[in-house]
Amino acid sequence: MAIYHLTAKTGSRSGGQSARAKADYIQREGKYARDMDEVLHAESGHMPEFVERPADYWDAADLYERANGRLFKEVEFALPVELTLDQQKALASEFAQHLTGAERLPYTLAIHAGGGENPHCHLMISERINDGIERPAAQWFKRYNGKTPEKGGAQKTEALKPKAWLEQTREAWADHANRALERAGHDARIDHRTLEAQGIERLPGVHLGPNVVEMEGRGIRTDRADVALNIDTANAQIIDLQEYREAIDHERNRQSEEIQRHQRVSGADRTAGPEHGDTGRRSPAGHEPDPAGQRGAGGGVAESPAPDRGGMGGAGQRVAGGSRRGEQRRAERPERVAGVALEAMANRDAGFHDAYGGAADRIVALARPDATDNRGRLDLAALGGPMKNDRTLQAIGRQLKAMGCERFDIGVRDATTGQMMNREWSAAEVLQNTPWLKRMNAQGNDVYIRPAEQERHGLVLVDDLSEFDLDDMKAEGREPALVVETSPKNYQAWVKVADAAGGELRGQIARTLASEYDADPASADSRHYGRLAGFTNRKDKHTTRAGYQPWVLLRESKGKTATAGPALVQQAGQQIEQAQRQQEKARRLASLELPERQLSRHRRTALDEYRSEMAGLVKRFGDDLSKCDFIAAQKLASRGRSAEEIGKAMAEASPALAERKPGHEADYIERTVSKVMGLPSVQLARAELARAPAPRQRGMDRGGPDFSM
């Protein structure tokens, strides 16, 4: 969304600055040319006659400007991300003309991409007024001669000096940007005023800047980004608290109206009751209604104790000499209505605190005076404590504890390329680097976890489960050590089968469980990543129309070994031994060296078969296209198709492959085919197919064994 950011700096020779170096930097020229792709647009204006290219002017400023003179004024401002590049160019040029056009001050501007999420503009302005008089470079920067301007240097503007100039510039930028957003049809707006002046109850944000964005993009954690993320989190919770407060006020008003309505209908607001003939008008005794709306009926009025926060506590007032039935009605009906309402509100209170436990404390802590230094800047050290109750940290901590490993592989999948960035961390390092992981997730990347490669463990991942599958697993002694909800009603389970089990055993158990519970077979191996709780699922198919992604939630974290764990390990060992015997048999059969052409004698192409298989599988499994790919490839491989044939068929016929696996389609195909070709059942089927005579092979081709799940 559009954000407001504008800063102004002065570059002077006395301060050690160089105008040429600054111009080279913002235009990515000279020694900065290696990063020239960062510059989306550059332009200059109001340059004097001696200038052939903008660098000449800023070179001359370094050479000829007086020792105590100011070389340039730099204005840096964030461009609205909602605008296209052409719209951003037009906006930056328009604003530059606003600041320089009246006196024709020479300027150079450059728009930087800022990693795609932080587009911004650097504007360098010279204080020398271009009055149209032609002067050489050496004369241009001399002292101005008011009597004979052509003999002196260019006059300096006074407009950039007053302190009011910065406030005027900040306001002008907000006006220009908002007009551009309005012209482009966007509802977003920016405001140059302080949050207090706007009447907004939230913490001021921190501008990251291009260097921080670049470092974070390369996987380098920065304190400034951590602070910005903490503030964003706190502000989101402030908004939640404000909405909750408004909801409570609304509920109280509604319940108050409900109570009054009950009183009017039942007559409980009448002190004498209906048998005394009270019609709601002035009583015969002439008593006026009391402030609480109760009426006297003769005799004195005794105040009952004030109600506590938990309920009404009574009928409000007791009237001496009133009807016993009326008094009983007053004592019961309004109290019952109010009691139910307030009990419901109390339950909502409890639910809110469960969801936002510690949020208010953190917000107050973030806003406290000692969170800033004596210059009003945020103190990084002071912000560590307030986030100790962060719910993402809590979820991560519980997941790490339930997994029970010493070291973990953390994977961050790049949203654009699909490549995985890996980090091997201890549990403490994972928690320490949570702010950086949040930043990566906020930029559209998914966050994953698995035990480190050298870690001795007995965890097996079962992916793509339903609630019914989880219930069946628990009933059959395969209860998970932890359960993660990756998207609404879709779960991953880590099953602990032993304190330590080899990778081959874990892989076999994963395939067994995936087959028994109709889970994702493509994820059934010993090294597959699972989701890390506390972050959002950034896959496009889970994004709502409003642009929201579901949170990855930790549903269970018992960390216990499954009851059937030892039996699963034993069964897997037997299956591995059987597979090894089958592979040995397949090798002996392969030694017969039947012609390869006998394996591939098919009347239909691999592409035809793949499309035919996918048509039935998609009807069966719906949107789970990865499972369809895996089973289709398994069937083709069992019929003798080569890995190359299967890969080509998958590349051409797999539905929406580019949208599902953007940037890593080839890697996905290679991994899927490799897993399929390594299955013992596939190897045995291929060996038997190779041994069979040609007619037998064609018969199997038409019918073929069914390896579907």
UniProtKB/Swiss-Prot annotation:
Region (DNA relaxase): 2-186
Pfam family, one: MobA_MobL
Positions with biased composition (Basic and acidic residues): 251-261, 272-290, 324-336, 698-709
UniProt entry tagged with the keyword Coiled coil: yes
DNA primase as annotated region, ranges: 315-709
Free-text comment on the cofactor: Divalent metal cation. Can use Mg(2+), or to a lesser extent, Mn(2+), Ca(2+) or Ba(2+).
Localisation per UniProt entry: Cytoplasm
Outcome recorded upon mutating Y32F: No decrease in conjugal transfer frequency
Outcome of swapping E76A: No decrease in conjugal transfer frequency. 10-fold decrease in conjugal transfer frequency and great reduction in the rate of DNA cleavage
Keyword Coiled coil set for record: yes
Regions annotated as coiled coil: 567-594
Keywords: Calcium, Coiled coil, Conjugation, Cytoplasm, DNA-binding, DNA-directed RNA polymerase, Isomerase, Magnesium, Manganese, Metal-binding, Mobility protein, Multifunctional enzyme, Plasmid, Topoisomerase, Transcription, Transferase
Gene3D superfamilies hit by this protein: 1.10.1240.50, 3.30.930.30, RepB DNA-primase, N-terminal domain (3.30.70.1790), Single helix bin (1.20.5.460)
EC number per UniProt: 5.6.2.1, 2.7.7.101
Family note: Belongs to the MobA/MobL family.
Name listed for the protein in its UniProt record: Mobilization protein A
UniProt source species: Escherichia coli
Gene: mobA
